[in-house]
Amino acid sequence: MSLYRPVVIGSLELPGNLFLAPVAGYTDHAFRSICAEEGACFSFTELVSAEALYRNIERYGLSTPKANSSSSPSSLPVSPCGEKNKSNAAAINLIRRGENEKRYAIQLFGAQSESIYRAASLLAPLKPDAIDINCGCPVPKVVKNGAGSAMMKDPSCIGKAVEIAVRASRESLGGIPVTVKIRSGWDSSSINYAQCAQIAIEAGAVMITLHPRTRAQNYSGRSDWSHITDLVSRIKVPVTGSGDLYTPEDAQKMLKETGCAAVMFARGAMGNPFIFSAARSLLETGSWQPVPFSAQTSVVMRHLEMLAASIGERTACLEMRKQFCAYTKGIPGGAALREKAVHAETIADYRSIMQRA
């Protein structure tokens, strides 16, 4: 049987098991749309602060919902941020559905369950297909506030966050699935992914994504896929595996070795959205073909044009620089292209750079 197969996450049915991870600074609506074109079956927004979202709803293009129950957050004070339109557009692009995304989840983080409830309750206009609670981010500015992987130090916090997100989903979002992303643990002396996953499931989570590194490891060393294998054997909801997926062969190996339901590409997809179609080809046929540079050029320009349509050409060209670095990593003459891109200020500038590559 093919390793490429459908995945059922609560009430959500997905046609395949190749997912795009939330990656801060990269997985905005334009990149997620590109990845969907290339075969990503499910994608996640960059992590969004629940606190920031509900306190700055205008910036995110949302509005306070009308009260429809005593538990509605509509009567709670909200502070509009007053940002300029371009800043607002950038924020909106973090959480809105991409042009070609058929299925996507909005990922929230926050140490306070009340913040998660309020934020999740505002998401109905965006029509996400799931809410994902980030309990694995190792970044200091997230962890210092007790969110992200810091929640694994007190697994009961994960349960509270999931429970309140499920409640918000039921009351305001039609009961869409709530999922959770975790790590192996805080450090090597506190490997507690199984406990955290079980608590999340008891609170209502219907999928667990495991990045099998500790918070102390950050992204160093090798991820321990045996933790994924173990978790699959312990729980009944789908487990999505993440960590060290850089090639189609890596995806094939993880699915075979761990028995996970799906794989989630993160750094391996940055600048390489083609990894999804390549991985599907390998899983279904046993082989895959590299994408010609001409196709890569076309994707780079389409990505830039989508950004420009939403945040303006000048801002898009600045934002594209980091994406361009990822797209040109490892190709002949890539360093020279990246040097030229530093000075690119228009779509025409980027097109000229790519045509001369």
Please tell me what each predicted stretch does.
Residues D154-A161, V299-V300, M320:
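Hydrophobic alpha-helical membrane-association signature
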Residues V23, V48-A50, F109-A111, G136-P138, ...:
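Active-site beta-loop-alpha junctions enriched in small/polar residues
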